[in-house]
Curated annotation (Swiss-Prot):
Database matches in InterPro entries: P-loop_NTPase, RecF/RecN/SMC_N, SMC, SMC3_ABC_euk, SMC_hinge, SMC_hinge_sf
Residues modified to N6-acetyllysine: K105, K106, K140
Description of how the protein assembles with itself and partners: Forms a heterodimer with SMC1A or SMC1B in cohesin complexes. Cohesin complexes are composed of the SMC1 (SMC1A or meiosis-specific SMC1B) and SMC3 heterodimer attached via their SMC hinge domain, RAD21 which link them, and one STAG protein (STAG1, STAG2 or STAG3), which interacts with RAD21. Also found in meiosis-specific cohesin complexes. Found in a complex with SMC1A, CDCA5 and RAD21, PDS5A/SCC-112 and PDS5B/APRIN. Interacts with MXI1, MXD3 and MXD4.
CDD domains the record matches: ABC_SMC3_euk
Species assigned in the record: Rattus norvegicus
Record SUPFAM superfamilies: P-loop containing nucleoside triphosphate hydrolases, Smc hinge domain
Gene symbol of the encoding locus: Smc3
Protein name, UniProt field: Structural maintenance of chromosomes protein 3
Length: 1191
């Protein structure tokens, strides 16, 4: 083992962390100038290892901290790393670090970074070979000089430290202290024995009078015992009688409380029934209000439908009359039209004949006029043209123009002909289209009527379903109110259960549920969810008669949480703490419960509690853990007997417990606050609530949902029908619009037909005139150019003039006649088209509309709706009447329940008054019992105070009455007054002092033996100390001579033990080996004393001659230092350490002696590590490793 590395920070001159290079296991030399920090390095190692720095005050710790410029150092540490490859330190590591940290308010040791105490460090170093009695493995600067100049007594002190006499001295001091304490005790015992002897002599004289006193006192105590015993027996009899009365009263009170509880249960049941009935009434009244509102709405709808049906019926009746009237009017219109058409048929041929004659006359007039014009033009061309050729040229040009004009006329005539033909064809086509549209219109009307009928059928069905849904809604509302009442009742029961349970436990249960909900939401830890089974109370059932004893037995264990394993509970608790949830939870992990089978006593007076519980066998361990060692007993007496005999907990049905350890607990238990009863009520309420919710969901809501779906389907059908209706009505309107448009087109074409015909006639007449002119011009072409008309042409002109006059006159006559006929035709046609036919169309349209209404679709649908609404009104009124009857019956039931409530209240009050009366009586009996118990205690106390009595005292006076006893007692007291001055405790004191004397004598003998043992121990210690000094002196003296000869070859040195008497009046010197023959010479006892040694002298001869031996005072400074070094080496060889630290031990030596010291260190470094500081070269030569220090 050796120092491998030193780390220093903040210590003295070392501000920053300084790591000293790894040291060699042999000789290490540190060189440096003065003030470079060599000594502080040694101080740092001493700071960790030496006792010198063991108890530092705050100011001393601050003095060790580095002081310099810059920030203040608040802590420092020195760490030494040891090479422990030889396992010299009892630590199984090759490297061991020891650090000491100091600050203004701390001083701590760390071994391998773990904090340890100073004593642990010192013990560890001692186990490695560091001796507290030999501090010379560290030699500080100046220590050599100090030893060189030290007196002999100081060297003797050093020798005693090396020999380890400190331990002997410490034990001797302890022995002296014990001896002084023992001596003091012996003196006190002697004083007490002297006092007791004197007191016993006095008490011997008082014993005679005391005998007489004791005689009468014995009689007095016997009499008093008899009196007290009789009073005690009388009191016990009264107490037994009172206990019987209390038991009877208690039984009666229990019966009254049970009756009172039954009354309260009945009242609570009645209150619950009243609440339910009131809720039912509220629901029925609310339903009645809804029915009333529905009935008002239904009556309103019925009134509307009745009015609508009446209007429709009136309309149908009126339509029948109107139809008759319209048909009659239509017939008249048809007759008039036929008459007018007949008139028109008679007039049109005349008109056509006159018109044809007129057209022919006009055509002939135009032709004759054109011919005459041509003849006059022919006559005029004689003067117009100068020559025949010029005329022919003009004629040709004119013929060309005429041909073009004739062609244009022909084209116009052909176009008009085509137009007239098209008009006629369009007229036929229009008529066909009109007939086709009329047929389509009839089909659309039939389809619309069918859709109307279907629409009203679907609507009636929808109204019926809505009425059924309204009824179901009312039912659902009633069920919802019942559900709300049940939920409120459940919340009240849960609140009562919460009030009977601790807040911390409830918070714990809620928190566990939150953790499990968190797992479920996250979908994690499924095995934890499956492994949690709820609290104990929710996992078993039992008869109500056992509720009290079961609940008292389990206590808060009812709320322990059952889990499959400790892993499940750990997972839950980890999440519980992670979520920082409140509450208190206790788990029962089934895999960790160690439950053994219990042998129950076979008796008819007790049964195992666990046999009365019903639970899942899977949780058998949990229930055996809680209830397995408890018996239900018939009475407290049975409980007490069985608890003692079978070491089991016993309990009565009333909850009175007897622990197997002997403790008794019991008293009145309020069953109204039974948590099991409350839990049963909560569970029952939850089941009823679940049944109501299931009923609501399965029946009503499912039917409502079904009806809603059907209504939605019917609404969709109605929408589809309405869409089809709109489509067909739009088609009907479009068809009517097309028919009207076709009719208007036909009338328009008829209006334009006659003008086109007249235009055609005019164009044809004009064409004939133009053709006649063209023929005339062609005939003239090539003829001679006349100057005047020929005779024939003149005749023709005259004839044409006569014809034109006749035609004009005839045409005027025809025109007048045509105008007259045309006026008749126009008037007749106007009357037909604008009056008769238009009115006929209106009549036909009204008849069509009447035919649509006469279909009865609307009236049928309205009648059907009216029947349905009447049925709903009837049903609503019937339901309302039923509700009125139910409300009356329910209110009557409430009144009956309230009467019953009053009866039970009165009964409960009577029971309460009886209980209060019994309670007062019980209090009186309790007070009396207390007084009797007090009297009993007083009697028993007085009997105890009488002390021990002879056997005859218990029987001698038993036959006497109290009066006789008191008379004898009075006589005794009179006699006892004569001995009032007697020390009544003389005998007791005599006995007491005698016993004390014996004890003190025994104690004195023990102290004498102890004193002798201490003296023997001190002699042994003194002998061992003497032997240790002698042995150490021999070893050191021998080592000193050998080391000195090696340091100074040929020289001689010896140690001399100096002696003297104890007083110090004489002294003598003893050389090496003479001490043992002189043992004990300086002591008057048989045990030699070390006090005879006065010092250790040194005698040396540097020449080796015996005659030149000199004392230390006669040596030079260098010689003294060398001798001191030799002594240190001798001490170290006597008590070797793992390593040594020398701080400038060679500063006073010359070069030759420094070389000798270096060789000595080199020799010793084979078995131990040396760390030395120097600024001389000699030590460096033998160093295995050297390093420099600089500031």
């Amino acid at each position: 083992m050796y120092i491998k590395q030193v780390i220093i920070q903040g210590f003295r001159s070392y501000r920053d962390q300084t790591i000293v290079d790894p040291f060699s296991s042999k000789h290490n030399v540190i060189v440096g100038r003065n003030g470079s920090g060599k000594s502080n390095f040694f101080y740092a190692i001493q700071f960790v290892l030496s006792d010198e720095f063991s108890h530092l005050r705050p100011e001393q710790r601050l003095a060790l901290l580095h002081e310099g410029t810059g920030p203040r150092v608040i802590s420092a540490f020195v760490e030494i790393i040891f090479d422990n490859s030889d396992n010299r330190l009892p630590i199984d590591k090759e490297e061991v670090s020891l650090r000491r940290v100091i600050g203004a308010k701390k001083d701590q040791y760390f071994l391998d970074k773990k904090m340890v105490t100073k004593n642990d460090v010192m013990n560890l170093l001692e186990s490695a070979g560091f001796s507290r009695s030999n501090p010379y493995y560290i030699v500080k600067q100046g220590k050599i000089n100090q030893m060189a100049t030290a007196p002999d007594s100081q060297r003797l002190k050093l020798l005693r430290e090396v020999a380890g006499t400190r331990v002997y001295d410490e034990r001797k001091e302890e022995s002296i202290s014990l001896m002084k304490e023992t001596e003091g005790k012996r003196e006190k015992i002697n004083e007490l024995l002297k006092y007791i002897e004197e007191r016993l002599h006095t008490l011997e004289e008082e014993k005679e009078e005391l005998a007489q006193y004791q005689k009468w006192d014995k009689m007095r105590r016997a009499l008093e015992y008899t009196i007290y015993n009789q009073e005690l027996n009388e009191t016990r009899a009264k107490l037994d009688e009172l206990s019987a009365k209390r038991e009877t009263s208690g039984e009666k009170s229990r019966q009254l409380r049970d009756a009172q509880q039954d009354a309260r249960d009945k009242m609570e049941d009645i209150e619950r029934q009243v609440r339910e009935l009131k809720t039912k009434i509220s629901a029925m009244k609310e339903e009645k209000e809804q029915l009333s509102a529905e009935r008002q709405e239904q009556i309103k709808q019925r009134t509307k439908l009745e009015l609508k049906a009446k209007d429709l019926q009136d309309e149908l009746a009126g339509n029948s009359e109107q139809r008759k009237r319209l048909l009659k009017e239509r017939q008249k219109l048809l007759e008039k039209i036929e008459e007018k058409q007949k008139e028109l048929a008679e007039t049109e041929p005349k008109f056509n004949s006159v018109k044809e004659k007129e057209e022919r006359g006009i055509a002939r007039l135009a032709q004759a006029t054109q011919e005459r014009t041509d003849l006059y033009a022919k006559q005029g061309r004689g003067s117009q043209f100068t020559s025949k050729e010029e005329r022919d040229k003009w004629i040709k040009k004119e013929l060309k123009s005429l041909d073009q004009a004739i062609n244009d006329k022909k084209r116009q005539i052909a176009a008009i002909h085509k137009d007239l033909e098209d008009t006629e064809a369009n007229k036929e086509k229009n008529l066909e289209q009109y007939n086709k549209l009329d047929q389509d219109l009839n089909e659309v009307k039939a389809r619309v009527e069918e859709l109307d009928r279907k629409y009203y059928e679907v609507k009636n069905k929808k109204d019926e379903l809505q009425s059924e849904r309204n009824y179901l809604w009312r039912e659902e509302n009633a069920e919802q109110q019942a559900l709300a009442a049940k939920r409120e009742d459940l919340e009240k029961k849960q609140q009562l259960l919460r009030a009977a349970t601790g807040k911390a436990i409830l918070n714990g249960i809620d928190s566990i549920n939150k953790v499990l909900d968190h797992f479920r939401r996250k979908g994690i830890n499924q095995h934890v969810q499956n492994g949690y089974h709820g609290i104990v109370m929710n996992n078993f059932e039992c008869e109500p008669a056992f509720y009290t004893c079961v609940e008292v037995t389990a206590g808060n264990r009812l709320f322990y949480h059952i889990v499959d394993s400790d892993e499940v509970s750990t997972k839950i608790l980890m999440e519980f703490n992670k979520m920082n949830l409140p509450g208190e939870v206790t788990f029962l992990p089934l895999n960790k419960l160690d439950v053994r089978d219990t042998a129950y006593p076979e008796t008819n007076d007790a049964i195992p509690m666990i046999s009365k519980l019903r639970y899942n066998p899977r949780f058998d361990k949990a229930f055996k853990h809680v209830f397995g060692k408890t018996l239900i007993c018939r009475s407290m007496e049975v409980s007490t007997q069985l608890a003692r005999a079978f070491t089991m907990d016993c309990i009565t049905l009333e909850g009175d417990q007897v622990s197997h350890r002997g403790a008794l607990t019991g008293g009145y238990y309020d069953t109204r606050k039974s948590r099991l009863e409350l839990q049963k009520d909560v569970r029952k309420a939850e089941e009823e609530l679940g049944e109501l919710e299931a009923k609501l969901n399965e029946n009503l809501r499912r039917n409502i949902e079904r009806i809603n779906n059907e209504i939605d389907q019917l609404m969709n059908q109605m929408q589809q029908i309405e869409t089809q209706q709109r489509k067909f009505k739009a088609s009907r309107d479009s068809t009517l619009s097309e028919m009207k448009m076709l009719k208007e087109k036909r009338q328009q074409s008829e209006k334009t037909f006659m003008p086109k015909q007249r235009s055609l006639q005019s164009l044809e007449a004009s064409l004939h005139a133009m053709e006649s002119t063209r023929e005339s011009l062609k005939a003239e072409l090539g003829t001679d150019l006349p100057s005047q008309l020929s005779l024939e042409d003149q005749k023709r002109v005259d004839a044409l003039n006569d014809e034109i006059r006749q035609l004009q006159q005839k045409n005027r006559q025809l025109l007048n006649e045509r105008i007259k006929l045309e006026g008749i035709i126009t008037r007749v046609e106007t009357y037909l088209n604008e009056n008769l036919r238009k009115r006929l169309d209106q009549v036909e349209q009204e008849l069509n509309e009447l035919r649509e209404t006469e279909g009865g679709t609307v009236l049928t649908a309205t009648t059907s709706q009216l029947e349905a609404i009447n049925k709903r009104v009837k049903d609503t009124m019937a339901r309302s009447e039923d509700l009125d009857n139910s409300i009356d019956k329910t209110e009557a039931g409430i009144k009956e329940l309230q009467k019953s409530m009053e009866r039970w209240k009165n009964m409960e009050k009577e029971h309460m008054d009886a209980i209060n009366h019994d309670t007062k009586e019980l209090e009186k009996m309790t007070n009396r019992q207390g007084m009797l118990l007090k009297k009993k205690e007083e009697c028993m106390k007085k009997i105890r105070e009488l002390g021990s009595l002879p056997q005859e005292a218990f029987e001698k006076y038993q036959t006497l009455s109290l009066k006789q006893l008191f008379r004898k007692l009075e006589q005794c007291n009179t006699e006892l007054k004569k001995y009032s001055h007697v020390n009544k405790k003389a005998l007791d004191q005599f006995v007491n002092f005698s016993e004390q004397k014996e004890k003190l004598i025994k104690r004195q003998e023990e102290l004498d033996r102890g004193y002798k043992s201490i003296m023997e121990l001190m002699n042994v210690l003194e002998l061992r100390k003497y032997e240790a000094i002698q042995l150490t002196f021999k070893q050191v003296s021998k080592n000193f001579s050998e080391v000195f000869q090696k340091l100074v070859p040929g020289a001689k040195a010896t140690l001399v033990m100096k002696k003297g008497d104890v007083e110090g009046s004489q002294s003598q010197d003893e050389g090496e080996g003479s001490g043992e023959s002189e043992r004990g010479s300086g002591s008057q006892s048989s045990v030699p004393s070390v006090d005879q040694f006065t010092g250790v002298g040194i005698r040396v001869s540097f020449t080796g001659k015996q005659g030149e031996m000199r004392e230390m005072q006669q040596l030079s400074g260098g010689q003294k230092s060398l001798v001191a070094l030799a002594l240190i080496f001798a001490i170290q060889k006597c008590d070797p350490a793992p390593f040594y630290l020398f701080d400038e031990i060679d500063q006073a030596l010359d070069a030759q002696h420094r070389k000798a010291v270096s060789d000595m260190i080199m020799e010793l470094a084979v078995h131990a590590q040396f760390i030395t500081t120097t600024f001389r070269p000699e030590l460096l030569e033998s160093a295995d490793k050297s390093s420099g220090k600089s500031e």
